[in-house]
Amino acid sequence: MKILYSLRRFYHVETLFNGTFVLAGRDQETTGFAWWAGNARLINLSGKLLGAHVAHAGLIVFWAGAMNLFEVAHFVPEKPMYEQGLILLPHLATLGWGVGPGGEVLDTFPYFVSGVLHLISSAVLGFGGIYHALLGPETLEESFPFFGYVWKDRNKMTTILGIHLILLGLGAFLLVLKALYFGGVYDTWAPGGGDVRKITNLTLSPSVIFGYLLKSPFGGEGWIVSVDDLEDIIGGHVWLGFICVFGGIWHILTKPFAWARRAFVWSGEAYLSYSLAALSVFGFIACCFVWFNNTAYSSEFYGPTGPEASQAQAFTFLVRDQRLGANVGSAQGPTGLGKYLMRSPTGEVIFGGETMRFWDLRAPWLEPLRGPNGLDLSRLKKDIQPWQERRSAEYMTHAPLGSLNSVGGVATEINAVNYVSPRSWLSTSHFVLGFFPFVGHLWHAGRARAAAAGFEKGIDRDLEPVLYMNPLN
């Protein structure tokens, strides 16, 4: 066997169970990678790598279609989506398909269509992936120079980056078009408890849109996660669309400047590490967004946020005890603070009790009861609507707490329902999808930088502690 690495250093650090194993005409001897290193064997085979990526896209779209149809088949219209463990139908409902006032599902056919379209798309992608992985040219450079590339070719790499940015920008514009012209989107803030509406008055002011980026991520500020009206969300997508499209055109037309050529490592593994870092950032932002935001992720579909369920409980008992004759404005709790109402650090009137920590929650069922100084006592006495009572009682019993095999909801709430909130699912999964790509980013960045600097990857076996330990037997 030809040795591709110094035996002293064990360059690739893979110890093979079966060093002679050949897969798709490639083995460790010719590629330097074992069979399980997957696409690493295809680093310099652009045609085969294209096949791997297209097939991967096919798997992703197949999951989306199959899971979509699975959720449609199991969907019960009489129960809220969040009580049924659904994670895809809420996204479709948020886009305004199949739902009406209050988030009630009127028609599941659009959901069925979505699932079938994704399945058909996945078949096309799957065929393309298999074709390019097994039958197509190993490398694209000779036959299709436009699609060919060399990892070190900085100009080609930024051109590919530009094409990706343009596609992302067009994706942002698709949401804008849906919201403005094609039926609108679901707005949880629509009067009377939410409805589908077209967005007419876009927020395009740069001070508002980019103001979100300058906010603190903590407390009531909440960075971009604090966005609470659809005009800002859709206006933000207009900005994103233009930035991505013009940035893409810029990257296609220009070559990297000298400072960029010096600052970056220009290799396949380096690009992988950059991509993983970006995915990691997306994962962490998505985690916070789905956990805290009830505008982009309407509580009608995803269930209440944690703070929302807590405030709903305080509101429900305020309503009950007020009916029983309690004076909610002056009743004292066991700590000497107000039992139902108290003041926040900045002087607003807020709910008392343990939920005081969530005083800066904003929710569509609660905001109509606020005045210029927080909760308005006269509105609490005279203006509470039946839909607000119903919704808060529902949210109170569906807190996004609990684990796979537990009773969901607040542990002390006797009416809680056995369920796990989609917010719990989506935020925990996206935290994991933020954390592990970050570890992968560090790993691949380290390898890429080591390779670029010219020293060998892996551990020097001469200094490995195990060499100096007594045998176990």
Swiss-Prot record:
User: For this UniProt entry, what's an example GO CC term?
Assistant: chloroplast thylakoid membrane
Source organism per UniProt: Secale cereale
Q: What family is it from?
A: Belongs to the PsbB/PsbC family. PsbC subfamily.
Which residues, in ranges, are excised as the propeptide?
A: 1-14
Q: Which InterPro entries match?
A: PS_antenna-like, PS_II_antenna-like_sf, PSII_PsbC, PSII_PsbC_sf
GO annotation, biological process: photosynthetic electron transport in photosystem II
Protein name per Swiss-Prot or TrEMBL: Photosystem II CP43 reaction center protein
Cellular location(s): Plastid, Chloroplast thylakoid membrane
Looking up Pfam families in the UniProt record yields: PSII
Q: Could you say which residues form the signal peptide?
A: none
Q: How does it assemble?
A: PSII is composed of 1 copy each of membrane proteins PsbA, PsbB, PsbC, PsbD, PsbE, PsbF, PsbH, PsbI, PsbJ, PsbK, PsbL, PsbM, PsbT, PsbX, PsbY, PsbZ, Psb30/Ycf12, at least 3 peripheral proteins of the oxygen-evolving complex and a large number of cofactors. It forms dimeric complexes.
Locate the coiled-coil region(s) and give their ranges: none
| UniProt function note | One of the components of the core complex of photosystem II (PSII). It binds chlorophyll and helps catalyze the primary light-induced photochemical processes of PSII. PSII is a light-driven water:plastoquinone oxidoreductase, using light energy to abstract electrons from H(2)O, generating O(2) and a proton gradient subsequently used for ATP formation.
Instruction: Write out the entry's keywords from A to Z.
Output: Acetylation, Chlorophyll, Chloroplast, Chromophore, Manganese, Membrane, Metal-binding, Phosphoprotein, Photosynthesis, Photosystem II, Plastid, Thylakoid, Transmembrane, Transmembrane helix
- Entry annotated with the keyword Thylakoid: yes
Q: Which residues cross the membrane?
A: 69-93, 134-155, 178-200, 255-275, 291-312, 447-471
Q: What is its main location?
A: plastid
Cofactor stoichiometry and binding?
Binds multiple chlorophylls and provides some of the ligands for the Ca-4Mn-5O cluster of the oxygen-evolving complex. It may also provide a ligand for a Cl- that is required for oxygen evolution. PSII binds additional chlorophylls, carotenoids and specific lipids.
Q: According to its record, how does it sit in the membrane?
A: Multi-pass membrane protein
